[in-house]
Amino acid sequence: MTPARSSGPVLAVVGATGAVGSVLLQLLSVRADVWGEIRLIASPRSAGRRLAVRGEETEVLALTEDAFDGMGRGDTAVFLTPADVSARWAPAATARGAAVVDQSAAFREDPRVPLVVPEVNAEDVRERPRGIVAGPDCVTAAMAAALGALHAEYGLRDLTVSSYQAASAAGRAGSEALRRQISLVAGTSLGGMTGDVRRAVGEDTGPFAGPLALNVVPWCGGLAAGGWSTQELAIRAQTRRILRLPALPVAVTCVQVPVMTGHSLSLRARFDGAVDAGRAREVLQAAPGVVVVDDPAAGEFPTPVDAAGTDPAWAGRLRASLDDPCSLEFFVCADNLLHGSALNAVQTAELIAAEFA
C-alpha cells in the first residue's frame, strides 16, 4: 500500500483508471496539496498499474475491503464509479469513519445524502448523516452555478433546458464509439440519403440510441413514464434539490451530439420579476465557477471545443426574452469530465478536509 506522505488526510480515488478518474488525477496536480496520502483504487483487473499523481508513481489497489484500511475520520473517499459499485462499496469507507463523495446516481435521491455543487450550496456538505455527499450529473453541474447566481438575484420560477451532450459522458466506450463511427464516414458523401449513415456505421452504435457520427440523437438514458427519459427526469430532480426549489417547474430535453468533450445547454429561465440582460451578465461575471463569453458581433460565444479542458462553465448568448420581460435566454458549455464531475468531486472533498484542518 502507498505510504502516507505526511500527517494530512487520506484521499482515496475509487475509479482512478476511468475517464473521470484520469481527469481528476491531472486536476490534483494543479490544486493546493491538502492531502497526506492520495490512494488510488480501481477494479481488480486494474490493480498493480502505476499512475503518476503529483509527480509520484502510485500503485493502483484493487477495490476490496482492505483498500480502505487505515482510513478514518477526516479522510475522504471519492467514488467515480457506476452506481452499483458506489452503492456496494461506499459503506465500506464510511464504516471506517471516512467521508464519501460519490459522483454516481447511487445516492442522489436519498434525503439523508446532500447533493452538492460547491459554488451553489457548499454549506450542505456539513450535513451528511450517512457520511456521504453526492455530486450531480454533468448536465446539472454545467448549469448549476449560473442558475444559482441568477436565482439569488432574481428568484427563479420556471426553467426549460435543452442539453447537447458529448460522447465522453458515456465514458471511454462513448468516446471510442464516436471515433470509430467518424472513421467510417470520414471522406465520404454520406448523410444525404435515408439510411446511408446507418448502413456505414452498422448495428453497433455503442452506448448511444442511434448512430452519432453526422447525426444527433434526442435521447439519453432509459425510458421513463410519459415518454421522458430517465436522465431528463434526473436533471429536473437534481436542479430542484441543489437550488432548494422543490416545486420548480423544469422541462428538460436531452440530445446526444457528435462532440467528444463538452456539454452544451440552451436555457430559458423565468424569474419573479423583469430581467435586464446587462445586469444578468454582470451577475454571471461575478459568479464563482462561471466565465462569461458573450460578444456575438465579434464571434465570441461559448462552444464545447473551447470549454473543453477548462474548469469553469462558459456562459453566453444572454438575451432578454422577446415575449416575456421576466425571462432570460442563454447558452452554457462546460467540460463534462472536468467541470461536470472531477472538479465537483475534488472541491467537495477539499471542503470536507477543511473541516478537520
What label would you give each PLM region?
Residues M1-G206, A247-P249, A313-W314, L318-D324, ...:
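N-terminal Rossmann-like NAD(P) cofactor-binding subdomain of oxidoreductases
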